[in-house]
Amino acid sequence: MDKKPLNTLISATGLWMSRTGTIHKIKHHEVSRSKIYIEMACGDHLVVNNSRSSRTARALRHHKYRKTCKRCRVSDEDLNKFLTKANEDQTSVKVKVVSAPTRTKKAMPKSVARAPKPLENTEAAQAQPSGSKFSPAIPVSTQESVSVPASVSTSISSISTGATASALVKGNTNPITSMSAPVQASAPALTKSQTDRLEVLLNPKDEISLNSGKPFRELESELLSRRKKDLQQIYAEERENYLGKLEREITRFFVDRGFLEIKSPILIPLEYIERMGIDNDTELSKQIFRVDKNFCLRPMLAPNLYNYLRKLDRALPDPIKIFEIGPCYRKESDGKEHLEEFTMLNFCQMGSGCTRENLESIITDFLNHLGIDFKIVGDSCMVYGDTLDVMHGDLELSSAVVGPIPLDREWGIDKPWIGAGFGLERLLKVKHDFKNIKRAARSESYYNGISTNL
């Protein structure tokens, strides 16, 4: 389908989309050779290029927006027209009106009025037996002056016939008066864009059904009011970001249990990736954010922790216990449960006491501390071989390993060890019952799971 220019799109909807995703009502606009002069209902004026590929043109074609201008007072009718793709996709049908051949009429004096045609067979109609079909008499002049579309005429005929028959069975001599009053039309069904907008505003604690039949604007207004109150309450009381708060809570948990906190570089040599067994033929290699031919953003915390274990083994007593919390980066294609920028927790212990039982005990204490249900199942992965997966339902929270493993030799490690890695965003998703992991991530669109596009 051809991309329509901006003037065609705003003429079809009567609306304007700002750079911030705000819908405005257009009061007046003029189109020159390459420019459009627009006056909004709120009083704002602007001059824009009549482009097919501008941000506003794309937004109008995709029928998406963030909010409406309060001063423009965009009506529900205008909003539904904008959100319904039919106004752009429907093909128009040209109707050719053909007039009937005119008959020559005799001229009549202006002073003489045309008398209505008398009803025919009135007496015969009144004398009909009760078993015959009832047909209310309609003046011929009325029949000639009222034009009804065929579809409407058919439905009216079927309704009146059914009502007439029902009334005659019940003995009602005036079946027209027995017809019930028309039923009030319910609110139109929500479009996909409207549903997506409301789901962004919904929180797990909201007991609001999107199938309640309420108009979109009423549902949106109620949810916007709730989200603003939620943000105001956070600003007045807690003032803590969920991700930062969880990081501090985890840090305190492991420090209290004798683990040393590590903060290692985010930019690492590509050589580390190769030493982890990730070559160019593996799937994980395609997910690496390469900075240049020598460095990349770390996709995991393990390489730096391997180096710390080897170096600290020369100075610290047995066993060595360390942990790190920090951002990692991968080019992920599945956005439902994965993020390209995510926060990892890795903890490991090297030396004595590195058994599966001890590893499961640390994991159990940790998740019980956070109040998260889980189960541990066996699995395997490309990097570490056999692993223990920590699951919450169908969601993987962690992969845990009991060493030594063959990969250790690449990093100069020759002692037994245990360790596990957790994604903090997944822990928050489970802890707060978020439907979308992006609500728990570093984001400008959400704060503590609350949409900021208000």
Curated annotation (Swiss-Prot):
Residues 123-133 have a biased composition (Polar residues). InterPro entries: aa-tRNA-synth_II, aa-tRNA-synth_II/BPL/LPL, Phenylalanyl-tRNA_Synthase, Pyrrolysyl-tRNA_ligase, Pyrrolysyl-tRNA_ligase_C, Pyrrolysyl-tRNA_ligase_N. It comes from the Archaea. GO terms for molecular function: ATP binding; pyrrolysyl-tRNA synthetase activity; tRNA binding. It is found in: Cytoplasm. Its EC number is 6.1.1.26. It is an enzyme of class 6 (ligase). Its main location: cytoplasm. Belongs to the class-II aminoacyl-tRNA synthetase family. This is Pyrrolysine--tRNA ligase.
